[in-house]
């Protein structure tokens, strides 16, 4: 109802860090999102997701901006985090919601420091490390993430189209190949863990169109140091929206944009959620034309990685650890790991859709 008062992602943006790691309250929705795959010294494997969303509920106006009451409800913060225990085929998820306020939740605007109760993600300018703390009833994580190269701007200088109309877009950057180490507490045990993580930041206002059902999003790390971010915006008729795109990232941090015509995604067998009834494709084939012709097979490491979000009033989605096998035209094999997110299989994402 307040959508017209919020800023929209309309033009390419001149990103400035660390400022753009921080909050952008002039946009309605944004998120700080981290996924990764970790292993213990004994090679026990885990996947993790950690996301804090900020959702504006009051329009951005000069009158509102002058109010200094710290208890004024302007933003809601939502936490979604999960641990995929690959060895035991267990998925442990947690969610929480809070208004912004002292001791509850919030986000700084000048750098990455975002928190919801005991859960926090920060960027330390001195050490150049991202620090992440997750505290849930089932597990706790305390991680340090070290960047390999600067953030990668997706789309057109960070303007990432999600539909054909002006404003159906987000500002979006990725930070792949974050060398990760830290501590996992699970079932009264503590494990030293290490691995690779991926950070995504997006901010926007109602970026989806009414004809769109959801998206399929991939963040993949390959064993040779390359990486891939790719999303398919899915129409309600099942077709791939022309705004679908991706970014191929080379080991030195240079990147190449992939348009809708540069790839084909083919869903494979599905897993039926006993909780929501949704059918999620848990195996995919991906055919790429760029940066070189190749075919990827992407498979879930655990079938049930559905985030049931009834407690935080968002649509259910599947978010989980995957393995990747790549075969190029020379029949050379390359392996990788990453994360897959699938939305809109249970219900469409009305909160992110543009209302005219």
What are the residue ranges of the model-derived segments?
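Structured soluble/peripheral alpha/beta segments that form catalytic or ligand/cofactor-binding pockets
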Residues: 2-356
């Amino acid at each position: 109802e307040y959508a017209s008062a919020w800023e929209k992602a309309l033009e390419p943006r001149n990103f400035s860090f660390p400022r753009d790691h921080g909050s952008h309250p002039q946009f309605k929705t944004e998120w700080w999102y981290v996924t990764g795959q970790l292993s213990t010294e004994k090679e026990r494997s885990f996947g993790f997701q950690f996301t804090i969303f900020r959702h504006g509920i009051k329009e951005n106006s000069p009158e509102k901006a002058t109010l200094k009451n710290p208890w004024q409800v302007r933003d809601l913060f939502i936490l979604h985090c999960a641990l995929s225990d690959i060895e035991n085929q267990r998925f442990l998820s947690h969610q929480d919601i809070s208004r912004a306020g002292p001791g509850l939740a919030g986000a700084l605007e000048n750098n990455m420091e975002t928190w919801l109760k005991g859960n926090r993600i920060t960027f330390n300018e001195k050490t150049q490390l991202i620090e992440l703390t997750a505290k849930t009833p089932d597990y706790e994580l305390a991680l340090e993430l070290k960047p390999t190269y600067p953030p990668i701007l997706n789309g057109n200088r960070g303007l990432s189209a999600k539909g054909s109309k002006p404003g159906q877009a987000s500002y979006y950057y990725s930070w792949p190949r974050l060398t990760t180490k830290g501590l996992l507490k699970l079932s009264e045990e503590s494990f030293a863990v290490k691995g690779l993580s991926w950070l995504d930041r997006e901010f926007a206002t109602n970026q989806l169109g009414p004809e769109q059902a959801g998206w399929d999003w991939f963040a993949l790390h390959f064993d040779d140091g390359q990486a891939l971010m790719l999303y398919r915006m899915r129409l309600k008729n099942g077709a791939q929206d022309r705004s679908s795109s991706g970014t191929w990232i080379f080991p030195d941090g240079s990147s190449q944009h992939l348009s809708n015509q540069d790839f084909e995604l083919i869903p494979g067998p599905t897993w039926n959620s006993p909780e929501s009834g949704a059918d999620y494709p848990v195996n995919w084939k991906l055919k790429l034309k760029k940066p070189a012709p190749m075919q990827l097979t992407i498979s879930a490491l655990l079938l049930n990685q559905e985030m049931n979000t009834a407690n935080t009033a968002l649509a259910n989605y599947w978010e989980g650890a995957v393995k990747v096998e790549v075969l190029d035209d020379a029949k050379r094999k390359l392996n990788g790991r990453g994360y897959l997110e699938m939305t809109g299989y249970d219900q469409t994402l009305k909160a992110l859709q543009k209302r005219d």
